[in-house]
Amino acid sequence: MAPSIKLSTMATSLHRAHGTSALLRRPRLWAPRLSSIHATPTIANLRASFTTSSPRLFAPNGSAKDESKPAVSTVPKTTGRGPSDPLAAIDKTAQEQRKADWAIMKEMSKYLWPKGSWGDKARVLLAIGLLVGGKVLNVQVPFYFREIVDSLNIDFSTTGGSVTAVAGAMILGYGAARVGAVVSQELRNAVFASVAQKAIRKVARNTFEHLLNLDLSFHLSKQTGGLTRAIDRGTKGISFLLTSMVFHIVPTALEISMVCGILTYNFGWQYAALTALTMVSYTAFTILTTAWRTKFRRQANAADNKASTIAVDSLINYEAVKYFNNEAYEVGRYDKALAQYEKNSIKVATSLAFLNSGQNIIFSSALTVMMYMGAHGVATGQLTVGDLVLINQLVFQLSVPLNFLGSVYRELRQSLLDMETLFNLQKVNVTIKEQPNAKPLTLTRGGEIEFKDVTFGYHPESPILRDLSLTIPAGKKVAIVGPSGCGKSTLLRLLFRFYDPQKGAIYIDGQDIRSVTLESLRRAIGVVPQDTPLFNDTVEHNIRYGNLSATPEQVIEAAKAAHIHEKIISWRDGYNTKVGERGLMISGGEKQRLAVSRLILKDPPLLFFDEATSALDTHTEQALMENINAILKGLGQKGEKKTSLFVAHRLRTIYDSDLIIVLKEGRVAEQGTHRELMERNGVYAQLWRAQEMLMTEEGEVSKKGEKEEVGEKKEA
């Protein structure tokens, strides 16, 4: 099973982003470009076109680009409510960042207190109850400690008695309070886990669903590595944000308030004022410093996305890397991105050291002053030693949540940044939408397709189709031919509503496709692309993808109809054979026959074949075309023959079409049957003769080579 060969890294990356139809026009083995047929075709010219010209890539702006030159993206930027690039690192002012943070927290509060979900609300309330109970028990611990110290401040040799009699009850109370606080904390975590995980699932699912619903232009302009990395970090941030909101920020504020109240009541306002001042200073320093550090983390995230994207692209395009000996180049690209990540991560680490040092200085200074005040009270007889211990324990007990709050705030900022990217993805506008009153597509005429005065360009200022009008009769086999960039594959994208035309309309049986539901429209169209997108799963799964409810018997019948069954059962694992990433473990011809099997299983009334036999040898191509023609003659659910469109450069594969439409410069140059077009002696006739001449010469060259090889063997 030879792997299919990809001609460039751009080919595979564009295919991966596209996922539905091939974006590239492979160099034809013997079919010359229609764009070159204006001159009288000669054998010398035809040979030169294949031996000296670079492969040409299909350009969305309607032109053909030389692959030897650096490719420039022609995909329009995503427009809508979200940013043009939701993955980009955008520096914001402090006010803008706070506004964005509050918007995210407001959004997440919906998941914290979900409407209609009384079970989740009960869990949140129970978690809060356990939280308050745990904090109350935690604050009781220093009081037990004070009583133990004061009760033991006696001369046991004089008074007699034992530790159990003097402080036993308080020691048990001390232990019970600590155990109760810990148990409450763990129960709280267990109760709230369900709420957090449900939120993660909902956000991740909504984001994934939104990505699948986004326009083709978005996926052409984004790289999978960066998207998956952003989703991964964002979903992890959700759990931390919800947990920190409920279990860290609110509890710490509650504990600080309780400690300040206790200090004021027992020892005077001075202790409470010093504690409050310390907390305010600590919090302000943490917030300001973390806000300053945010830009370093954002830059590190951008570098991380870049490195992940490069790694994924290089591994997916493994064969292309090997074909051109570019391992060192790819490693260099990856290392360059890692170097940028290293640079920004060092800034993150050094600024973190500054933050930690400042926090410890503030807290330690305040604790030192408070201990001096307590020691002075003991010396003057106003306080007992137990009171000094109580003050120390109460304030020092705040160090744990405060230190944790510092790290929580840092991680909270990180989570908010990650979630900002995630929610920005959800804000990217979907431009291809159903009308509110959209109805299912109904084929009342058998599937007649009409393009009426259609003008479209990926860039509006550079239209590919210009006032294009054509009709594809219902139940007929129609071929679309023309030079690369004339809009052949664009017809499918418009028909499938990946894009809407800037002008004009497209009708199926008289129904404007913009007025029907997307689900019914796309279910009615079956596609066999030039480069078949396959999942890294079994052969059976990839065929069944055309109809997920199909039985194993139906899968086998579809494979037989596509002339791939015998090949599949010859493999060791048969239909359970894994095809590899994008089907790289099987040949291009096998991939295309799997695509035909998938189409047969879907059984749609409208069929689109985009160079569907380009990777097949002549014998297999002929057999498969005969089988496809037999399928086309099959009747649909209502008795109509299937309407089929073939995009082709090999004219021998479509000469028997009921109608052949030749596109040129975004318009219909001519149309008719093969006989009519040959009699007209126009563009189509020139191309046909050019291909026939080339095939004749190639046959002569092949025979000459065989004779020379036989002669050499005889001489030997």
From Swiss-Prot:
Protein name: Iron-sulfur clusters transporter atm1, mitochondrial
Annotated residues for binding of ATP: 458, 482-493
Protein EC: 7.-.-.-
Entry-linked InterPro entries: AAA+_ATPase, ABC1_TM_dom, ABC1_TM_sf, ABC_transporter-like_ATP-bd, ABC_transporter-like_CS, P-loop_NTPase, Type_1_exporter
Pfam families membership: ABC_membrane (PF00664), ABC_tran (PF00005)
Biological source species: Neurospora crassa (strain ATCC 24698 / 74-OR23-1A / CBS 708.71 / DSM 1257 / FGSC 987)
Subunit details: Homodimer.
Record's bilayer topology term: Multi-pass membrane protein
Compartments (UniProt record): Mitochondrion inner membrane
Class of enzymatic activity (EC top level): translocase
Segments on the Mitochondrial matrix side according to the record's topology features: 19-123, 193-241, 288-353, 410-716
Domain ABC transporter residue range list: 449-690
Name of the encoding gene: fes-4
